[in-house]
Amino acid sequence: MREIVHVQAGQCGNQIGAKFWEVISDEHGVQPDGTYKGDSDLQIERINVYYNEANGGKYVPRAVLVDLEPGTMDSIRGGEFGQLFRPDNFVFGQSGAGNNWAKGHYTEGAELVDNVLDVIRKEAEGCDCLQGFQLTHSLGGGTGSGMGTLLISKIREEYPDRIMSSFSVVPSPKVSDVVLEPYNATLSVHQLVENTDETFCIDNEALYDICFRTLKLANPTYGDLNHLVSVTMSGVTTCLRFPGQLNADLRKLAVNMVPFPRLHFFMPGFAPLSARDAAAYRALNVAELTQQMFDAKNMMAACDPRHGRYLTVAAMFRGRMSMREVDEQMMQVQNKNSSYFVEWIPNNVKTAVCDIPPRGLKMSATFIGNTTAIQELFKRISEQFTAMFRRKAFLHWYTGEGMDEMEFTEAESNMNDLVSEYQQYQDATADEEGDLQEGESEYIEQEE
């Protein structure tokens, strides 16, 4: 079986990670004590991707939990699913990273990293045929961003031919805990560009907007935001966890989704959106799901896809529905909005259907888009970074841990290069020289 080793780092990474395990354990019929109480063979057929089968028929997540302070892990261990995880897989320090990327990456985190790698190695050795790793973390703090990216590069060194994917929570001024977020995020992106194969950008700004505008929550809490993250992660990993043909493992997903190695930052989306305690009032049909799924308001990254073009798209429908109708609806979206899909990658939209819907819904759809509009997210961080960096504000926290200003300058220019690369492919047309083919001029003008 093709296994995935899951790593969660830092407070945010551990909170969304714990939520992810709750949701998928429920979908696979795994009780909080690790016993299987499911009712369908589909639940168990590929359960080995994320779970080890221990003695006594217990299922144990292939998860490694990492933090530089004990707090978040204590609450996971004391929570409902705390007994699910292997006790040796909790690796934590005492000092904390103080929301400082340098502490996570170079000092405190670097001291703990070998202990973590030992546990990861043990998990990887227990795999029959390891396909890769997934990391949940945030880019705004110290541990998830600094130590998370350190772990990625160390894992990459040791397992160079395995796929590395990350669920990265991108900071936003709307939901801000830390004034250092733009620094931490930029330094992290600098690492992710080089060292991950696929990164799902989960943007706090977008999560906040969804809670506020769509779900009408006056004061969204992190619990509300994390609920959205967990349905998205459940949807994105459906193809990996249930039997099916399309994007059935991390490598196939990467092959379909990443046309150029640096451009591997995906925008996830989900439909229908509902608050965590509200049941969906009515079932949507396939047409409505498809329409919602492509809607900017349903995206988990605060970028408008209409400001860019899709390089590639993967869609995942869940529930009992007609395949034919799904294909028709997906074709219709592409035909009506053809200018938003680059014409130089034919068949760049892939669709999969899985019979088992998420809990509480008859059917749902998950969207993964590789769109050039994601540059808006990087521009937003870059602007905030530059505002602080040109005044050298707060830099002493980083240089005090042994960092050099040069590294900031490099990270800044790497992120700006990334933005230009997205722009370059947004403007690219099918013919090389950039000459207009006949009848193409009006289409370009309408693009502008």
UniProtKB/Swiss-Prot annotation:
<comment type="similarity">
    <text>Belongs to the tubulin family.</text>
</comment>
<dbReference type="InterPro" id="IPR002453">
    <property type="entry name" value="Beta_tubulin"/>
</dbReference>
<keyword id="KW-0493">Microtubule</keyword>
<dbReference type="Pfam" id="PF03953">
    <property type="entry name" value="Tubulin_C"/>
</dbReference>
<feature type="binding site">
    <location>
        <position position="144"/>
    </location>
    <ligand>
        <name>GTP</name>
    </ligand>
</feature>
<keyword id="KW-0963">Cytoplasm</keyword>
<dbReference type="InterPro" id="IPR037103">
    <property type="entry name" value="Tubulin/FtsZ-like_C"/>
</dbReference>
<feature type="compositionally biased region" description="Acidic residues">
    <location>
        <begin position="429"/>
        <end position="448"/>
    </location>
</feature>
<keyword id="KW-0342">GTP-binding</keyword>
<dbReference type="InterPro" id="IPR008280">
    <property type="entry name" value="Tub_FtsZ_C"/>
</dbReference>
<dbReference type="InterPro" id="IPR023123">
    <property type="entry name" value="Tubulin_C"/>
</dbReference>
<dbReference type="InterPro" id="IPR018316">
    <property type="entry name" value="Tubulin/FtsZ_2-layer-sand-dom"/>
</dbReference>
<comment type="function">
    <text>Tubulin is the major constituent of microtubules, a cylinder consisting of laterally associated linear protofilaments composed of alpha- and beta-tubulin heterodimers. Microtubules grow by the addition of GTP-tubulin dimers to the microtubule end, where a stabilizing cap forms. Below the cap, tubulin dimers are in GDP-bound state, owing to GTPase activity of alpha-tubulin.</text>
</comment>
<feature type="binding site">
    <location>
        <position position="69"/>
    </location>
    <ligand>
        <name>Mg(2+)</name>
    </ligand>
</feature>
<dbReference type="InterPro" id="IPR036525">
    <property type="entry name" value="Tubulin/FtsZ_GTPase_sf"/>
</dbReference>
<dbReference type="GO" id="GO:0007017">
    <property type="term" value="P:microtubule-based process"/>
</dbReference>
<keyword id="KW-0479">Metal-binding</keyword>
<feature type="binding site">
    <location>
        <position position="69"/>
    </location>
    <ligand>
        <name>GTP</name>
    </ligand>
</feature>
<protein>
    <recommendedName>
        <fullName>Tubulin beta-1 chain</fullName>
    </recommendedName>
</protein>
<feature type="binding site">
    <location>
        <position position="143"/>
    </location>
    <ligand>
        <name>GTP</name>
    </ligand>
</feature>
<dbReference type="GO" id="GO:0003924">
    <property type="term" value="F:GTPase activity"/>
</dbReference>
<feature type="region of interest" description="Disordered">
    <location>
        <begin position="427"/>
        <end position="448"/>
    </location>
</feature>
<feature type="binding site">
    <location>
        <position position="11"/>
    </location>
    <ligand>
        <name>GTP</name>
    </ligand>
</feature>
<keyword id="KW-0547">Nucleotide-binding</keyword>
<keyword id="KW-0206">Cytoskeleton</keyword>
<dbReference type="InterPro" id="IPR017975">
    <property type="entry name" value="Tubulin_CS"/>
</dbReference>
<dbReference type="InterPro" id="IPR003008">
    <property type="entry name" value="Tubulin_FtsZ_GTPase"/>
</dbReference>
<dbReference type="GO" id="GO:0046872">
    <property type="term" value="F:metal ion binding"/>
</dbReference>
<comment type="subunit">
    <text>Dimer of alpha and beta chains. A typical microtubule is a hollow water-filled tube with an outer diameter of 25 nm and an inner diameter of 15 nM. Alpha-beta heterodimers associate head-to-tail to form protofilaments running lengthwise along the microtubule wall with the beta-tubulin subunit facing the microtubule plus end conferring a structural polarity. Microtubules usually have 13 protofilaments but different protofilament numbers can be found in some organisms and specialized cells.</text>
</comment>
<feature type="binding site">
    <location>
        <position position="138"/>
    </location>
    <ligand>
        <name>GTP</name>
    </ligand>
</feature>
<dbReference type="GO" id="GO:0005200">
    <property type="term" value="F:structural constituent of cytoskeleton"/>
</dbReference>
<dbReference type="InterPro" id="IPR000217">
    <property type="entry name" value="Tubulin"/>
</dbReference>
<keyword id="KW-0460">Magnesium</keyword>
<feature type="binding site">
    <location>
        <position position="226"/>
    </location>
    <ligand>
        <name>GTP</name>
    </ligand>
</feature>
<dbReference type="Pfam" id="PF00091">
    <property type="entry name" value="Tubulin"/>
</dbReference>
<dbReference type="InterPro" id="IPR013838">
    <property type="entry name" value="Beta-tubulin_BS"/>
</dbReference>
<dbReference type="GO" id="GO:0005874">
    <property type="term" value="C:microtubule"/>
</dbReference>
<dbReference type="GO" id="GO:0005525">
    <property type="term" value="F:GTP binding"/>
</dbReference>
<feature type="binding site">
    <location>
        <position position="204"/>
    </location>
    <ligand>
        <name>GTP</name>
    </ligand>
</feature>
<feature type="binding site">
    <location>
        <position position="142"/>
    </location>
    <ligand>
        <name>GTP</name>
    </ligand>
</feature>
<dbReference type="GO" id="GO:0005737">
    <property type="term" value="C:cytoplasm"/>
</dbReference>
